[in-house]
Amino acid sequence: MINIEEQTTTNTVIFLGAGISYVAGVPIQSEILKTICNNKEIFYSNNGNIFIKFLKDNFGLNENCDNLPTIEEIYSFLDFFISQNENLNSKYPVVKLKNIWNIFTQLICSVIETEVYVGNKADNAYNKFWQKLVELNHKISIITTNYDSCFFESFDNLYSQNYLLNYNIDFANYYDEYMRDINSFFWWDKAEEGVNNTKIIDVYKLHGSLEWLYCSNCNKVMHLPFFHANYNLENGELKQPLIFNEKGESIQRIATCPVDKCKYQILIVPPTYNKNFNNSILKDLYFKALLKLRMAKNIIFIGYSFPDADYHIKALFNRVNMTRKNVVVIDKFLDDNKKRKYLSICNHVKFKEIAFENCIDEFTSYLSD
């Protein structure tokens, strides 16, 4: 039997955190709640009002919204009552708490979507980094906990070089019955190594994606490349992405599954301590990512802060023999606490205190062949 830890192929896994999306305008987790409270569209919406009233009643939020709890505190508070199926009080029965939990998740999605602005700085850095990766004589895999796809949207420049992204999910996009009435803009080529000289970069989005619409009835995910679904702030309904023909006319809405007509949900794992990985698609991604890590010679972290709620990520690496791995952490803001978390999974980590956009030129020097 081949020991995957002893294979000779140079496999490099890059683990991307929020820091790589920050340059594109995506708020880091510690900024999301403040952004929610300062966003006028959210603040004056029905669901925004429900959520902020909940914070005032249970976390003492003041009028200036400058005494905010953490995201994890809010989710943990809600999870306590929901998991026990208990009311908080007469004002907040468990059914209302479940609704607030959903509203909070929807607001996080909305903030990430509306705050994104990919300027030249992000475009140039992303394109340059992708080109650097494909020039390596390595098998590249990317693992990320980010919901957004700012970094991956810049990959389209590599299609002409026969590169494809493989998200390791059997997307509904691959099946005619799902795509029969869907505009070709949402077609997604199935990544198969070697077909028409195709070269594959594997991607594992462990916390899901804002581009993934999930049908819980048929257990299929529709991938919406270069389009981001969003929620109606008044009623919580998933906004239906419009597809337009050459005349600019709306011809299709796909917020419901084309096959069984059930409502789609965005497939993400919220930043809560009590993460639910019962979804078979995300569970499968987790174990596929574990296999890639075991095969890797290089593991490069970029902009990942190792938040306390990501205990499952620590567990992921604790299941890997890190002894012979070349492990590098690239982060603009490295403090002792963050270093301690990394050293708990590997005692020979190399720390590079540098911003993502400034590390690209010397990136190859971080790798072992």
Give, region by region, the residue ranges found by the protein language model.
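Extended, H/D-rich, highly charged conserved domains that either
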Residues: 54-94, 133-269
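Active-site-proximal helix-loop elements at catalytic-domain edges
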Residues: 101, 105-115, 257-272
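A Trp-anchored, charged/polar loop motif used as the substrate-binding/catalytic surface
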Residues: 119-128, 181-190, 238-242, 274-290
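SIR2/sirtuin-family catalytic core signature
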Residues: 1-24, 29-40, 46, 53-55, ...
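Repeat-unit-sized solenoid/scaffold elements
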Residues: 91, 99, 226-253, 291-294, ...
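N-terminal start-of-chain detector that recognizes signal peptides
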Residues: 113-115, 173-179, 271-273, 299-303
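Gly/serine-rich nucleotide phosphate-binding loop at the start of the catalytic core
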Residues: 1-153, 159-163, 360-362
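Phosphate-binding glycine-rich loops and adjacent basic patches that engage nucleotide phosphates
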Residues: 87-94, 110-118, 248-255, 276-281, ...
